[in-house]
Amino acid sequence: KEGYLVNKSTGCKYGCFWLGKNENCDKECKAKNQGGSYGYCYSFACWCEGLPESTPTYPLPNKSCS
């Protein structure tokens, strides 16, 4: 699946400023706890592709970003 990476404790997206190819987003996406294949910055948040179905993405159910 694909989607915005989400911080499980805050319910917020992973923010980014360098749009498009983004090393930080790519690294976060490919981290063992996320399991994605490619990440980049889209609309100032990290978008991730190739995620396993088990990885939560934004928005988290019952948790709004605060």
UniProtKB/Swiss-Prot annotation:
**Segments crossing the lipid bilayer:** none
GO BP term, example = defense response
Where is it found, in Gene Ontology cellular component terms?
Answer: extracellular region
Q: What's the short name of a Pfam family annotated to this entry?
A: Toxin_3
The cross-references to PROSITE patterns, in alphabetical order and at most eight, read: LCN_CSAB (PS51863)
* Expression tissues: Expressed by the venom gland.
| Any GO MF annotation of the entry | toxin activity
Disulfide cysteine pairs (residue numbers):
12-65, 16-41, 25-46, 29-48
Q: Which family does it belong to?
A: Belongs to the long (4 C-C) scorpion toxin superfamily. Sodium channel inhibitor family. Beta subfamily.
Other notes: Negative results: does not show inhibition of peak current on Nav1.7/SCN9A (at 560 nM). Negative results: is neutralized by the single-chain antibody fragment 10FG2.
Q: What is this protein called?
A: Toxin Cll1
Species this protein is from: Centruroides limpidus (Mexican scorpion)
